[in-house]
């Protein structure tokens, strides 16, 4: 199988030193799993994956636990059947749901290997390009978990290794046993904690950062404004950023971003994602969606650059935030 390369699109970026090149916007498939997103259906989900591919996104991210029975991976397997040679597929292992849809962490090597094999079967793949430890298991050393990834590399079931939701100490311990090529942390205009220590370490060790939540669960897409009424079952209501002073601070940021969007002729979401994917150390930003128009919009963040005056204004807006 040919490796996706930079010749397919000039702005593709390399994951670590792997020779695997990806678009600066990736499709994140958590929303189509239907676990927390409302009004998800199979037809729209398949159309959304296809829209991502048609919009120039070659990087699709999923996980063993995206869906109580792996719905996300199964949909991806159907959608990419005729596109595999052009795509980079990432998945994750280490989390599963029980019959009561309660989440469990399991970082034992035998579990990680078994979950990888299940993911390969669901997506009808021979190899997963990038495979992450989804999160640390409090009962298993990350060093022990790392041994499974060495086994998966040696067996040809995965091409590159990543970790998600690990702190820097855990990353270093894992990396000492099995070298990592990418990490997947949250990062956006409202959450920049990784810049203190994590990004410098990644730059020093040639590790890519594939960030999730660039739009902070839709808040920075520009559609959720003051007075927005959330459905009672909307899981976003469990996040402090959607309440009180943090929410108002985000609204003030959006007020400023409106002006930049008008100036550039782009949407707020496109401005936010473009800024995010071009921050130092960021290789690709994961953008989810349950409808085709959503991923088409965020894919429109690729292929252009914010001017210096816009970047300076965004810096001022972020520095003025008051979010705990």
Please tell me what each predicted stretch does.
Residues 1-87:
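N-terminal binding-site loop/beta-alpha segment at the start of enzyme catalytic domains
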Residues 4, 136-323:
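Beta/alpha (TIM)-barrel catalytic core signal, keyed to glycine-rich beta->alpha loops juxtaposed to Asp/Glu
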Residues 27-29, 62, 91, 130-133, ...:
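Conserved beta-strand positions
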Residues 31-43, 99-113:
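Active-site mouth loops of central-metabolism enzymes
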Residues 45, 49, 72, 109-112, ...:
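Aromatic/hydrophobic pocket-lining residues that form the small-molecule binding cavity
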Residues 82-107, 134:
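Structural motif corresponding to the early beta-alpha repeats
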Residues 111-132:
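CE4/NodB-like, metal-dependent polysaccharide N-deacetylase domain
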């Amino acid at each position: 199988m040919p490796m996706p390369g930079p010749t397919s699109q000039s702005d593709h970026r390399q994951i670590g030193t792997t020779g695997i090149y990806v678009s600066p916007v990736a499709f994140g498939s958590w929303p189509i799993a239907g676990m927390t997103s409302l009004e998800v259906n199979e037809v729209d989900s398949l159309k959304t994956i296809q829209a991502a591919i048609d919009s120039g996104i070659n990087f699709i991210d999923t996980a063993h636990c995206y869906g109580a029975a792996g719905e996300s991976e199964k949909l991806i397997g159907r959608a990419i059947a005729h596109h595999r040679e052009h795509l980079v597929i990432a998945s994750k292992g280490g989390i599963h749901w029980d019959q009561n849809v309660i989440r469990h962490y399991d970082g034992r090597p035998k579990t990680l290997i078994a979950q990888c094999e299940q993911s390969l079967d669901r997506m009808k793949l021979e190899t997963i390009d990038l495979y992450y430890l989804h999160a640390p298991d409090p009962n298993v050393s990350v060093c022990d978990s790392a041994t499974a990834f060495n086994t998966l590399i040696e067996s040809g079931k995965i091409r590159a290794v990543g970790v998600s939701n690990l702190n820097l100490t855990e990353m270093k311990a894992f990396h000492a046993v099995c070298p990592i090529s990418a990490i997947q942390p949250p990062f956006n205009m409202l959450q920049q904690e990784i810049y203190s220590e994590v990004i410098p370490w990644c730059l020093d060790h040639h590790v890519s950062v594939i960030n999730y939540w660039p739009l902070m669960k839709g808040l920075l897409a520009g559609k959720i404004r003051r007075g927005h009424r959330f459905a009672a079952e909307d899981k976003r209501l469990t996040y402090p950023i959607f309440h009180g002073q943090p929410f108002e601070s985000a609204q003030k940021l959006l007020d400023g971003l409106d002006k930049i969007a008008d100036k550039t002729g782009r949407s707020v979401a496109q401005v936010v994602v473009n800024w995010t994917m071009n921050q130092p150390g960021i290789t690709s930003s994961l953008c989810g969606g349950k409808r085709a128009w959503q991923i088409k919009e965020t894919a429109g963040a690729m292929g252009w650059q914010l001017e210096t005056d816009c970047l300076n204004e965004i810096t001022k807006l972020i520095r003025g935030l008051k979010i705990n």
